[in-house]
UniProtKB/Swiss-Prot annotation:
CDD domains: AGPR_1_C, AGPR_1_N. This is N-acetyl-gamma-glutamyl-phosphate reductase. The keyword Heme does not apply. The lineage of its organism: Bacteria, Bacillati, Cyanobacteriota, Cyanophyceae, Synechococcales. The gene is argC. The active site is at C160. One of its GO terms (molecular function) is NAD binding.
């Protein structure tokens, strides 16, 4: 797995869904290469034993994450770990000049105190005091934070729901085209969003032929969405967010409702707004009025597909967004951030074409 310095990537948490998708993307990457695989539970085992469906040259052994070893073999590290673990490893890597992309929520909040309030269970077992590091971490939404990501040492990749919700919403908050109150987000995602560790609600017998809301009030991603929405709007944003689990493996569809300040704006006007904002961002597609996104249209791709409609009876703006929760909603966005950090075009090594049907 030896590669030229400056292109070497460690993937920690390699056998989880986020790690697996990251490895799959980097195996086809022309410039970045996986040189270290880390994982506590899988340490000491050959890759082919763990993931025979994703062969890697030389069949490397998964290592117990060791900061010194990671720094020896990698220039970048993608951390695909449960919440509360990345914050223990990332500071050690940064001290050793390894640049980090964290796929967990550990550094998504600029305020450590807010993270502790939202992630209470994880926080009670930790003695975190990395206030400054939380402030320095860059929120990894490339379409809105590209220049900051390019020079960052620590990037906190957004959650899947925030990604799908913020991409259509932010342009209208930025330009002051919608009211800041009364925002509602209804989102639906597949079972892979729950990770690879077995959970009862994700069993086939539980999830099949059924749809259910969860985290109806106070879902962790609510405050994450509000944080960037407030920053872009220039004032505090409080919104309602409700996720739903649907019986499919991957895919996420978010519908955002807001009220237009100008009742004369049409769906065509609002579509023009989105197209103008994202015209130089190849990972974003804006559909014509009357065409609405489907999760199948983004499957296995790093695309986000957006659409707009307006109910002129009440000036209600309806924003729709589809992403693959494991790609643009997780690993693909992480690789997009890696590309920017490495001085590469953001889409390097990633397919923007879906597998249909």
């Amino acid at each position: 797995m030896s590669q030229v310095r400056g292109s070497r990537v460690a993937v920690i948490g390699a056998t989880g869904y986020g790690g697996l998708q990251t490895i799959r993307l980097l195996e086809d990457h022309p410039h970045l290469h996986v040189t270290y695989l880390g994982g506590e539970r899988s340490a000491g085992r050959r890759w082919s034993e763990l993931c025979p469906f994703l062969p890697i040259l030389d069949d490397p052994e998964v290592q117990s994450p060791d900061p010194d070893k990671i720094a020896e073999f990698a220039d970048y590290a993608v951390l695909s770990l449960p919440n509360g673990l990345a914050c223990q490893l990332a500071p050690q890597l940064l001290k050793r000049n390894v640049r980090v992309v964290d796929l967990s929520a550990d550094f998504r909040y600029r305020s450590l105190e807010q993270w502790k309030q939202v992630y209470v269970h994880e926080a009670q077992n930790l003695n975190r005091d990395d206030v400054q590091l939380c402030r320095e971490a860059v929120y990894g939404l490339p379409e809105w934070k590209g220049p900051e990501i390019a020079v960052a040492n620590l990037v906190a990749a957004p959650g899947c729901f925030p990604t799908a919700s913020l991409l259509p919403l932010l342009p209208f908050l930025k330009q002051g085209l919608i009211e800041n109150d009364g925002l509602i987000i209804d989102a639906k995602t597949g079972t892979s969003g729950g990770g690879r560790v077995a959970k009862e609600q994700f069993l086939l017998a539980e999830a099949s032929e059924s749809i259910m809301p969860y985290g109806v009030v106070g879902h962790r991603h609510t405050s994450e969405i509000e944080q960037l929405a407030s920053e872009v709007a220039g004032q505090p944003i409080e919104l309602q967010f409700t996720p739903h689990l649907v019986p499919m493996v991957r895919g996420l569809l978010a519908t955002v409702y807001g009220r237009l300040r100008d009742p004369g704006l049409t769906a065509e006007d609002c579509t023009t707004v989105l197209k103008a904002v994202y015209r130089h961002h190849p990972c974003i597609d804006v559909l014509p009025v009357g065409t609405y996104p489907a999760t199948k249209w983004v499957k296995y791709s790093n695309k986000a597909v957006l659409s707009v409609q307006v109910d002129n009876r009440n000036s209600r703006l309806v924003l729709m967004s589809a992403v693959d929760n494991l790609i643009k909603g997780q690993a693909g966005q992480g690789v997009q951030c890696l590309n920017l950090m490495a001085g590469l075009p953001p889409t390097t090594g990633m397919s923007l074409l879906t597998f249909y049907p």
